[in-house]
Amino acid sequence: NYAGGNPGLMQSLFSNPGMPGFPIGQLRLSDPTPPLAMFPEKFSPPFRQAEYTFARGFSSMLPQLRTPYIQTWTFGLQREIVRHTVVEVRYVGNKGTHIWHGFNLNEVNVFENGFLAEFLNAQRNLAINQAAGVNSFQYRGLPGQVPLPIFDAAFGARGSQPALPAASGFSNGTFLNYLRQGQVGAFANALAGSSIYLCRMVGNQLPACARLGFDSPGPFPINFFQANPFAAGAAINLMTDYSYSSYHGLQVQVRRTYSQGLSFTANYTFSKSLSDLFADSPTMTRNYTTLRNRRLDKGPSPFDLRHVFQAYWSWELPFGTGRRWATGSSVVDKIIGGWTLSGIVRWQSGRVFRLSSDRFTVNQNDSGVILNGLTTKDLQKMLTVRPGPNATVFFVDPKLIGPDGRANPEILAPPTTPGVFGQFIYLYGPSLFLPDLALSKEIPLTERVKFDLWVTALNAFNHPSFEVGGVAGSVSIMSTTFGQTTATATGPREIQIRLKLSF
């Protein structure tokens, strides 16, 4: 299934402005349709990767992919503290090895190829040009400016192909924003994935570019941005067994066996679960932040629940004939007697989520956030639930929200330094509280006929428990609804009444 999206018997036709025969901004309704490019041009298995460049990525798996396994160890103490009641304290640990992890091998490179240095020069050129009233990062020979050979190649003429207009190059609004925001990774990814730009840089050295009509070589190698240029701008997903996990938990349980109409079990777990795979499925593709340092991804597992308390019980209420409190009236005792109250209560700390910024200052993966003047522990304390507008709730302190609805940049800001990641911060959302109660009674009619009555209240107190991010979720500080949620982890109160006649 992982490789099921690989190229097969499918062709696509397309035409983009800037491709050969389709000059940008020069097409009129009366003009003939620009020439269409076809990918692949023909089917002749085995399919060559080069036939799918600029069209789609590929997926594969390690030929020696191993089966994941978990090692578990535990020890505990158990003691009866009073009659019918036992306390057990236990430590449980486990370690997951060879966990399957699919990720993209085609990470964009901005370091060894000199693109980061050119990006910094482009930022400086832009600042100088804007001071002169020109909204462009092109080299204009002004004091302090330097030539930009990479961008000149990406936007300039190549063989018979003309140069791109300023709006598609040095004055492009998206590119200007990348420079202002320090998003060198986003800029590199935009150039690497576009035949319009990459083919002007590498020319007909890349077969896909030659097929598109580029008829001369370019000054840069075809793998300038990505290790596998035949999947330019796309992913080369590899399923591996590189990931791991660990779990350590302290469990305390109190059990009472049935005695005098009461039995119960209550347990509490304090635990910590870590992994380098922040995903809810091992077959889900989850890119490493950077292949240069896979240790950056070690953090809480998406299933990390630090505190969990559960209790369930059954209590025969002490009313009626033969019970502690009897009235002496057979009619009254039949009404108030024979009732059993039971329930299940669960309380747990919130699910973990990761803060993101939608900024790409290193590669095509999120670069994290910048936390100013606070520690992660301080930030966690500022998570609290309060009513919000339009049936939403806020799960953060109002101080964390700016006037535009995004995170307050004085506390939480996006990274802006090209080539440098921010902080990768994991937080825990609102806690969950779920009480389910039931009241039951056996009503004998004759020696052989009886009624059983059950009244069950799920989420008995109608207490909403809100969810943030979902399993393996992230929350963007750049969202205009930062700190808001409408998702609930539990449903509303539900009352069920059942009757059973036995004879």
Question: What does each model-identified segment do?
Answer:
Residues 7:
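Active-site region of glycoside hydrolase catalytic domains
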Residues 11, 17-22, 27-73, 78-503:
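Short, solvent-exposed micro-motifs at the edges of structured domains
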Residues 1-4, 89:
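ATP-dependent adenylate-handling active sites, centered on carboxylate activation for C-N bond formation
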